[in-house]
Amino acid sequence: MSAAMKTNAALDNDTLKGAIRIEDVVKIYDPDGAAVVAVDHCNLEVPAGEICMIVGPSGCGKTTLLNAIAGFHSITSGSIYLDDELLCGPSKPKADPGADRVVVFQNGALFPWKTNIDNVAFGPLMQGKLSKKDIYDKAYSMMADAGLSGSEHSFPGEISSGLRRRVEIVRALMNDPKVLLFDEPYRALDSLTKSVMHEALLEIYYKNKVTIFFITHDLEEAIFLGHRLIIMTSRPCKPKKIVEVDIPHPRDYSVLTSPHFHKIMAETKALVTEEALKAFEAGEKEG
């Protein structure tokens, strides 16, 4: 048994892929010779098929951890595994980016000069493993499943921000990834659009059962979407506590009115506030 802090399996299905295991990971930045420890001996397991919400103070190292999983940044020490296969470790400090892990960015990454359907089809077309017809058939089908029928031949700038977010998620799923990595994807959306996107994401998740590693500062978002929350410490980043969200899936927004939802919210807010105050006090001392 790994020493990693482990979340309970979200789904009892041995066929699911995308289990993440993070073992004793350290990340140290060294700008101008001044070492900054961003991640400090982080241990965590995320079972395949789980929606894992990562919550913690701003600047604590959450995105650094996501970037290491994605293969954007190296780690200083430790190991990260995907389905028991090494992504990065002592002999390989930086993971190879791959179609099995796809990032949905905070600021979006659609090509504005391509139509939405062409954006969705772009990745598989570049890979060249399927025929163009098969790729576009799949793209049309997935856009329809995501409520995007009628938007296929529009450009990203011609649809709402919420619909653009859906297009980005569909594009991310086109290569059948094991893991979707979200870095505050709905931060810029208004509350009503964000609510619609939450329910749309869950609908997409229920159909695809992909592992989701999702960074957010929005506690309501975290509890509504997640099977459980990983509360991170102030910098350097490591898990402080796992909060189980024992509200059955599928969910809709009626769960927000339940006493149990508010109980989880109170527990989570207390934990995050404690770490945010530590981060603030550390900043005051540094200043």
Model-derived features with residue positions:
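ABC ATPase NBD coupling module
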Residues: 31, 87-105, 126, 132-136, ...
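The feature captures the beta-strand-to-loop junction immediately N-terminal to the Walker
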Residues: 55-57
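Helix-to-loop junction immediately C-terminal to a conserved catalytic motif
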Residues: 70
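Conserved ABC transporter NBD signature motif
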Residues: 78-89
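Short helical segment in ABC ATPase nucleotide-binding domains corresponding to the A-loop/adjacent helical element
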Residues: 117-126, 136, 140, 244
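Conserved ABC ATPase "signature" region
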Residues: 132-151, 203
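Conserved signature/switch motifs of ABC ATPase nucleotide-binding domains
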Residues: 154-157, 175
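Catalytic Walker B motif of ABC-type/P-loop ATPase nucleotide-binding domains
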Residues: 180-183
